[in-house]
Amino acid sequence: MAQISSNSGFKECPSSHPEPTRAKDVDKEEALQMEAEALAKLQKDRQVTDNQRGFELSSSTRKKAQVYNKQDYDLMVFPESDSQKRALDIDVEKLTQAELEKLLLDDSFETKKTPVLPVTPILSPSFSAQLYFRPTIQRGQWPPGLPGPSTYALPSIYPSTYSKQAAFQNGFNPRMPTFPSTEPIYLSLPGQSPYFSYPLTPATPFHPQGSLPIYRPVVSTDMAKLFDKIASTSEFLKNGKARTDLEITDSKVSNLQVSPKSEDISKFDWLDLDPLSKPKVDNVEVLDHEEEKNVSSLLAKDPWDAVLLEERSTANCHLERKVNGKSLSVATVTRSQSLNIRTTQLAKAQGHISQKDPNGTSSLPTGSSLLQEVEVQNEEMAAFCRSITKLKTKFPYTNHRTNPGYLLSPVTAQRNICGENASVKVSIDIEGFQLPVTFTCDVSSTVEIIIMQALCWVHDDLNQVDVGSYVLKVCGQEEVLQNNHCLGSHEHIQNCRKWDTEIRLQLLTFSAMCQNLARTAEDDETPVDLNKHLYQIEKPCKEAMTRHPVEELLDSYHNQVELALQIENQHRAVDQVIKAVRKICSALDGVETLAITESVKKLKRAVNLPRSKTADVTSLFGGEDTSRSSTRGSLNPENPVQVSINQLTAAIYDLLRLHANSGRSPTDCAQSSKSVKEAWTTTEQLQFTIFAAHGISSNWVSNYEKYYLICSLSHNGKDLFKPIQSKKVGTYKNFFYLIKWDELIIFPIQISQLPLESVLHLTLFGILNQSSGSSPDSNKQRKGPEALGKVSLPLFDFKRFLTCGTKLLYLWTSSHTNSVPGTVTKKGYVMERIVLQVDFPSPAFDIIYTTPQVDRSIIQQHNLETLENDIKGKLLDILHKDSSLGLSKEDKAFLWEKRYYCFKHPNCLPKILASAPNWKWVNLAKTYSLLHQWPALYPLIALELLDSKFADQEVRSLAVTWIEAISDDELTDLLPQFVQALKYEIYLNSSLVQFLLSRALGNIQIAHNLYWLLKDALHDVQFSTRYEHVLGALLSVGGKRLREELLKQTKLVQLLGGVAEKVRQASGSARQVVLQRSMERVQSFFQKNKCRLPLKPSLVAKELNIKSCSFFSSNAVPLKVTMVNADPMGEEINVMFKVGEDLRQDMLALQMIKIMDKIWLKEGLDLRMVIFKCLSTGRDRGMVELVPASDTLRKIQVEYGVTGSFKDKPLAEWLRKYNPSEEEYEKASENFIYSCAGCCVATYVLGICDRHNDNIMLRSTGHMFHIDFGKFLGHAQMFGSFKRDRAPFVLTSDMAYVINGGEKPTIRFQLFVDLCCQAYNLIRKQTNLFLNLLSLMIPSGLPELTSIQDLKYVRDALQPQTTDAEATIFFTRLIESSLGSIATKFNFFIHNLAQLRFSGLPSNDEPILSFSPKTYSFRQDGRIKEVSVFTYHKKYNPDKHYIYVVRILREGQIEPSFVFRTFDEFQELHNKLSIIFPLWKLPGFPNRMVLGRTHIKDVAAKRKIELNSYLQSLMNASTDVAECDLVCTFFHPLLRDEKAEGIARSADAGSFSPTPGQIGGAVKLSISYRNGTLFIMVMHIKDLVTEDGADPNPYVKTYLLPDNHKTSKRKTKISRKTRNPTFNEMLVYSGYSKETLRQRELQLSVLSAESLRENFFLGGVTLPLKDFNLSKETVKWYQLTAATYL
């Protein structure tokens, strides 16, 4: 039916139809008799042929082509050849009515013409229905031909299933003749809807069971037009044959969308001129029964069997549309093709219908037989299962190495750990020993040696013991140390050393170790089933159609049909039938085919017919034709309602099959005998038709006026061409709303140029309705089009066949509505799924992408040294760049040109592949040859090849091969990136999937983490189907025990999520009650099960400690969940469970910090970072590990009032409270310095914002850490139009106070700066790694990481192109900027105001006073008889301050005791008394402001008197006040009170009074030389000395001597009021050669800048440069002396 151009390259197949021979004349009666005999003979012949073929397809293309070349001869040949000649010249349009009626009986009128397309090729379910009918609105893949009696022809070798535009550049020849055939063409469907739909990835597709023949019509188009014209003559009208208006309307509708069910067009109505043969119909609505009639037979029809109806008017029927700017009209003639549908009606509806017709042809399958097809897997799923089954056999349950049944403790490599001179105390519990065995060992000792030491206590002769059969289990956890690793490399041991806790282990044999997660023999024998174990997994996306729900809907439908056919009043029953149909369509994603729409309309019209007319209408099926139908095994309908229901039933079954088959491979369905053509030889352009979007919500209709699609074609994450925009259309309404485009999209690219991994992206946009007032967006009139959703489709399937046929693509979209059911997302959006129908061409051959033959010959590697210096330098500069992200087009072209010079720089492979100009088939052979000869990459380098920039399957497969060298522990750390990389895999069964599943089979920790990551990824609707398959494979191969454990964890998370939701929704006062009641249900879960913790599977909980469970008062109201450890030697398990917040970003930030910490540890830098675990267990919910003994900075600061954030001492004094001894405090301060340095670097590099004192925490051991990473990558929280985070990172004065040990800078601050700069430079060396890790997380849907642009912050923060010295200077300036930022303190203050909540005394577990760790009462300490302020002392700690000695005499004591309190501590006592007793009259506190200095003797003397008076008044106050716990705690002696050295200290203790002229101190310098320039970096100076003891204002001045003119003078900035300044400034001397510098000396002087007097000298040093090796950097401390200076 299509017009085909001459440029296709396919051979023409001219018609071989012979001229009919002339026979003798016969009269009409004899002719009719001959016709009847011929029909009977043809029926018999075709029945025999069908039985022989069994509806099987032909075995070869050659055989099929021969069949196509046969002509379907006329049944009879009449001798009127002369009349035929004359008929050639007859102009039908000019004949009178009488001549037309006379011509009707002239059998010679139908002359020999080019035959109409008689048959179609063997089709898959995705064929285009346009081959059989031509609707007046285009719905296929190709534009229609020009109107008029065009001849549509197809060559036998290329039986195209779609029509095409005459002038389209597709390579087809419109002059090719047709290929008639006597062979029936078999369809895989019982009927064709005018358009039909498929889902993208049906989990349970249908398989067509029967095949149906289509015969060549024996009446030409011209004859059909003639007969139609005769039917409108006056004589015909007189005989009562004029059609009613309804019939005419139905005819037009039929021409627009002719159903394949409508093959039974009236055969004899137009021929019967007897007015008595049929009743006269006047102004009565009568159905066109011949359009509704379902004929079930393979017999040949009347010669006029396939007459085509003509469109009544060009205006109504010749619909035009534009394609590429040109108006095209649809062909005016349509035909039924005599498509004899075997419509078996189900027994419920018509019980007397047989399942097969007399010819043995399969009927329409029953509901049961058809729905059995739903449960059949498609071929890609089956291939994946086979692959997983093969993988599973490589890991038998008998292999203990890959199936230990328990978890291994993770390890982290540390530099020089084997040589580390550190010892630890280890306690090992051994069976049979009451007490543990305790001994000291080196952390560098292997676990196997530790086991041998422990066995020495048990066995006298170790030679008789198999040491390898023993393991060391961690007490309190179900994990085992790895015998072949050092003890100190295990993370558990590192944490014990970090927290200074006891290392407790348990010695067990393998047999005694709990192995309840091991796979068994039964697991190995169980077949792989991807869907069997997913029933308990929460699936956020709507599942694909399955058998049972659809079966129920079909049963309901047939029940309604049976009822409608039995009762007298059919109107209400038919309404129920239509409702049942609507439910079926709704279950199929709201897809309603046009066949269903038209069938429903006809059913409504049929039920409205008067009963007096029913018999008349029924008679149309009676008489001679009735007996004929019965002999063919077809149902003879009794009334129009039954006919319409039959047609509706067939349309429903069509939709079921089409819905199930969509998305399957062209070779999935049916043993296709299509020929195969290689893609690289195919010159046709890529094209497809966007037909419609189904399932549109009513909210869209009101909110959006028009819709359009942006179609883009991408590869390697980039568009191959400029995206194409569809036309803008509105919505239509039948059962449901739909958007209809029916538009042909053509990409200007030949199929031969498409890479294998090409992906089609369709993005739906909506134009807001300007007049609608219901939109929630008040500013919508000013907004542009909204992106509503996006869907992607690979152009080649997993077998590398080009996609074809109709596809249903699931497009998920967010909408501003709460009324539509769907998946609720964050910020009030609702996820809606609509179905996008796209029609691809279905050619007669399958187009397959074949991999080019790789040249295995050795590539000639070029020597880089042979290049010219400038070219070599340019190439090296490119190779040394941190990432391919910064390469320009010129750089990429240059690098690709010089790629053969780069073999000795293997790490540059990602840059080279990213620079490839294209990935066309013709260029792949050379690229693959280069790839296979490239040296192997390190796993972390090869990780970049899994990014979206590298879609090629060969590249990704090789990358996985290199990554296989990664250890299990490293893989566990990087698992989130690998899970996201699955999105970039083009097919399900990829090397990456195989790699992850193989590692999961061998390591329980990997399997556990992979499960939770995959489960969380199910919420990504665009990839949820793929993740379901991988998750199903993981559960299938992991074994029953592991699967049951994971499902228990899932159940626990669901229960906790329900509790958290209830508590969150409850009012503040009722929350505790709700919590306690809800936790009882969780406790009942633990009564049946022990459960491993999702955060850490080595922790096993056996019950809840409900009394200890509580909730936090933040906005999300997270729960504090306390569980009892199943291991009696373990501690309680405390976690936080949170709902309402997306924890995935927190997971990513903590993952990056953990990787940073491991990088530092590998380089020997232990910054004592606090790494806690966080796990997202679902959408906006998750679990977080609680760090014990820690508080927020806000909670610490507000103990000193709401302005505590502006004070310097709160942190230091809080640490002193928990670390009272000097040794403990020094250790805590050191922990603070190291951990604070790590936090500063990590938060800056990651751009972590929204930092305030409620998300920075401090542990009592001094470790500082950050929580709550809702803002990162530089996306700062805004305060109006200003950023709340004004400083590069948080470093406040109270932190500096702890670092310095006081208010003034000390050498400890220099240590802090050095730690920061060292850590920063180590991370800078791994810039590419962090960019790759973050880049792989872009598709995860994190709100702050959506594109490559978000990575720009990290790249800029790491300064990859700078030297280490320059980076050190840069970060030093950041430290100075952060330390001097008043904005941070103000931010803290604002947060204190917002969060401060005082409600009486703190809870029992909180200290009542900031300087006392516990609360005490007079019952414990005894009542106080006398109290007074005895004296005061001056102390230094390290700053000068006064402490007041309080004399206390208690009842029963003879000797008084003394406690020492500061003025601030007295003030804290009074403030908290005021809070506890707001209605009591308390004594006045002496808090008047003191002008000038406060820490002087005069002020202390006055305060002593005032404080003594205050205490006397307090003790004489009411008993409730004087004897409260707060007062008792204040007077309770602390450790500092009991230390003798704390009673008094010399006034000048710690002070330094130098003798006149004394010089002291040292300077730290970095000296290097490169590119003709000498670099002097002045880093630190320590221990400077001044004559008067005052703090100087030091700066550094240098000269290169000799220098008579002082031209070499360089100076640093001035550092104010410090003896230990940090400069980190670079002094540069350019233009000096090494020979010149060897003759020079560097003179360095340190001076103090004074404003009121002359600068004075603090010390200096002279360094001869000849003593330095200028080829490398020298970093060293130099002692300052009293040298002369310029």
Swiss-Prot record:
Region: Interaction with PtdIns(4,5)P2-containing membranes, residue numbers: 1488-1493
First-level EC class: transferase
Annotated site residues (Not phosphorylated) in this chain: T244, T249, S251, S254, S262, S266
Biased composition (Polar residues): 49-60, 628-639
Occurrences of domain C2 (ranges): 1555-1678
Keywords of the record: Acetylation, ATP-binding, Cataract, Cell membrane, Cytoplasm, Cytoplasmic vesicle, Disease variant, Dwarfism, Endocytosis, Exocytosis, Golgi apparatus, Kinase, Lipid metabolism, Membrane, Nucleotide-binding, Nucleus, Phosphoprotein, Transferase
Bias (Basic and acidic residues): 19-31
Domain PX positions: 1422-1538
Name of the protein in question: Phosphatidylinositol 4-phosphate 3-kinase C2 domain-containing subunit alpha
Species of the source: Homo sapiens
Taxonomic path: Eukaryota, Metazoa, Chordata, Craniata, Vertebrata
Gene that produces this protein: PIK3C2A
